[in-house]
A protein has these predicted regions:
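Gly/Ala-rich beta-loop-alpha elbow adjacent to hydrolase catalytic centers
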Residues: 77, 81
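Patatin-like phospholipase
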Residues: 3-75, 87-291
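Catalytic DNA-binding helix-loop module of base-excision-repair DNA glycosylases/AP lyases
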Residues: 84
Length: 291
């Protein structure tokens, strides 16, 4: 099922609420997602990368960071990193997010409603996020949040930080070829994974001087026999990730195995890997957040 499986939290709501699918609505109202100034200049930013089912690792990272008593000024998230990061920025505790992640029944994925070209609508993701956060707008979340998207017309990467929170996450998680792009003010937006899967440079451009980045890409050196067909994809992802990874002050690249899955066992293992990798860097992380 690939990257689409990572967005199962939103799919769960789509199934439960029976939300309608509107494949090409142009969102033009005053609450449509947009780019605007942050409330304050951030010092510490957490950057949560894209990564398909491996993105469950973010849940474990946030759980560990919470136990360490650490908090960012800004969270910048790509794809599943936008989904998990937004829930946390909106006030959900890490253990609540973990519960949601583990309660997912993968069979529900089979009930997603297909759109054009055998793609799925991400409308359930928007509904889910807005329900969980009581309709808070992005600019009003307790922690400043940026949902990273690419504008399909020209591939420009930008970060929504104002407007409809759920719709911004839907756009950030609209995996090309699998989910219908989100149309906002005449432009089509989608997941930025093919442009900037670990948006550290974007966090820096917003003023962050200290950056923790969570890389969820595969460990190429541990590619097992039989996985050669994924070599090109792995190399592409590594090439896109490297320029940003090198700019992070603390980089977490948890060891979660090569093969990805949406099984409960896999989710538990990946969350645990994120937690362990974070705790292993506790001293460096505390120093990063020190005044």
């Amino acid at each position: 099922m690939g990257d689409a499986a990572t967005l199962a939290l939103g799919a769960l709501t789509a199934v439960q609420t029976g939300c309608a699918i509107d494949l090409d609505t142009d969102h033009t109202g005053p609450n449509a997602p947009s780019v605007g100034p942050l409330r304050t200049t951030p010092r510490v930013a957490w950057v949560l990368g894209s990564g398909g089912p491996r993105g469950f690792v973010h849940v474990g990272v946030l759980k560990a960071l919470s136990e360490l008593g650490l908090k960012p000024d800004l969270i910048v998230g790509a794809s599943v990193g936008a989904l998990v990061g937004t829930l946390f920025a909106g006030g959900l505790r890490a253990n609540e997010i973990e519960r949601l992640a583990l309660e997912l029944q993968p069979a529900l994925l089979l009930r997603w409603q297909p759109g054009s070209s055998e793609r799925f609508s991400g409308a359930g993701i928007a509904s889910f996020v807005n329900q969980q956060l009581d309709g808070q707008r992005l600019q009003a979340l307790p922690i400043a949040m940026v949902c990273v998207v690419q504008r399909l017309r020209d591939g420009v990467v930008q970060g929504f930080n104002q407007g409809d929170t759920g719709l911004a996450v839907q756009a950030a998680a609209a995996i090309e070829g699998q989910f219908t792009p989100v149309r906002i003010r005449g432009e089509r937006f989608a997941d930025a994974d093919l442009r900037m899967p670990l948006p550290v440079r974007l966090a820096r451009s917003l003023g962050a001087t200290r950056v923790l980045a969570v890389d969820t890409s595969a460990h190429e050196e541990r590619r097992p026999a039989g996985a050669d067909r994924y070599a090109t994809s792995d190399t592409r992802k590594r090439a896109l990730t490297r320029p940003d990874a090198e700019l992070a002050d603390v980089l977490l690249h948890p060891e979660f195995g090569y093969w990805a899955s949406v099984s409960t066992e896999y989710r538990q293992r990946v969350i645990a890997a994120g937690y362990a990798a974070t705790m292993a860097q506790a001293a460096a992380l505390k120093a990063l957040h020190a005044t």
